[in-house]
A protein has these predicted regions:
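Residue-level hotspots at or immediately adjacent to binding/recognition sites across diverse folds
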Residues: 16-350
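Sec-dependent N-terminal signal peptides
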Residues: 4-13
Length: 350
């Protein structure tokens, strides 16, 4: 009887561990800092980082090809959005002309400069795409309002959205270009971006492809180095924002909030918060899309209840993470310091 009980307990623990989230480290072949990652499928993913660097895998991460965009050695690519093994966009940050968007359609063999900011005061933080043709990118405030550009032709042209459609920024308000995920999109026209700074941490939302915006305050911590660093939405109503203070990596107070009404109102996560400052949050794109993963320099956390509570898994630090649907399961990667790349292990949960 005792033996049978022990076997049953062991089997249960094995089953639980088999579905538990985790990261499997993969050699990237570089020691640069990665800030962007984009999961395409179980086999294909892209990453981006400093010194004009990008990386790509087409074999599930067993090998990574690392390259440098010609003429971009001084640029820091904080965001990458990829659609397949051939097609990807890179966004670099910085004031004025350092803010750029490049595109490849041949797996990185060549890159086309699609956008270079002509505004000296602009500082682009991140971009997102609804589909292959329609995308959006946001900059810190220029003349008192956040600057947004959109494309409807696969990046061949990028146009500023109407200034009058953007609410005024608060004093000291800005975005955080930490992971390429302070802006996100959903459906065909919905978009959100998170902010921080000395006056508050807010989420801006648009339902018309970025032409007009509304804004809501959140309970996320704010300050000179604090605010919302990442937003993710499961659908048009349910979303999560994470952040904190990047100078206080272990501080978890007021580092996450959830919305159930499309970003009109935000509720602080209770005591079971992510375990420290978090630079990225993403839905694990498996069956049901009910699981979330958040990453930061002190480790990773997961939620199986739409962000209401969190559990830690692993102390290895990452800056960014990305997941995609693949054959009904979940495929994902995380990336960070010194060329660190890891593939997600574990089953998606409802």
């Amino acid at each position: 009887m005792m033996k049978a009980t022990l076997i049953a307990i062991a089997s249960l623990l094995l089953a639980q561990n088999a579905g538990a989230p985790g990261w499997e480290s993969q050699p990237s072949g570089t020691n640069i800092r990665f800030r962007g990652v984009s999961a395409v499928s179980r086999m294909v993913a892209w990453a981006s980082g400093e010194r004009g660097t990008y990386a790509r895998t087409t074999d599930g991460g067993r090998t990574w090809t690392v390259g440098q965009v010609p003429g971009a050695a001084e640029l820091d690519f904080r965001d990458v959005d990829a659609f397949d093994a051939d097609t990807a966009y890179l966004l670099s940050i910085g004031e004025g002309e350092k803010s750029r968007i490049y595109k490849t359609t041949d797996g990185g063999a060549s890159w086309q400069l699609q956008f270079k900011s002509s505004r000296p005061a602009a500082f682009f933080d991140a971009m997102a795409f609804w589909d292959r043709d329609h995308g959006i990118a946001m900059s810190d405030p220029v003349e008192g309002r956040f600057l947004v550009i959109t494309t409807s032709d696969g990046g061949r042209t990028w146009r500023e959205t109407p200034r009058e459609g953007m609410p005024p920024a608060l004093e000291g308000e800005g975005g955080f270009a930490a992971s390429g995920t302070c802006i996100t999109v959903e459906g065909r026209r919905n978009a959100w971006f998170g902010t921080g700074g000395t006056s508050g941490a807010r989420v801006f939302r648009s339902t018309d492809g970025g032409r007009t915006w509304a804004v809501a305050a959140t309970p996320v911590a704010h300050g000179k180095s604090a605010g919302i660093f990442s937003v993710a939405f499961r659908d048009a109503r349910r979303g999560v924002a994470v952040g904190g203070d990047y100078t206080k990596e272990s501080e978890s107070k007021n580092n996450a909030a959830v919305t159930r009404d499309g970003g009109r109102t935000w509720i602080s996560v209770g005591d079971a918060r992510p375990n420290g400052y978090r630079s990225c949050v993403a839905y694990v794109r498996g069956a049901g899309d009910a699981m979330l993963v958040a990453v930061g320099p002190t480790g990773s956390d997961y939620s199986t209840d739409a962000g209401a509570s969190w559990r830690s898994f692993g102390a290895e630090g990452f800056h960014t993470a990305s997941f995609t649907r693949a054959g009904g399961g979940a495929a994902g990667w995380a990336a960070g310091e010194r060329g660190r790349i890891a593939k997600y292990t574990g089953a998606a949960r409802n």
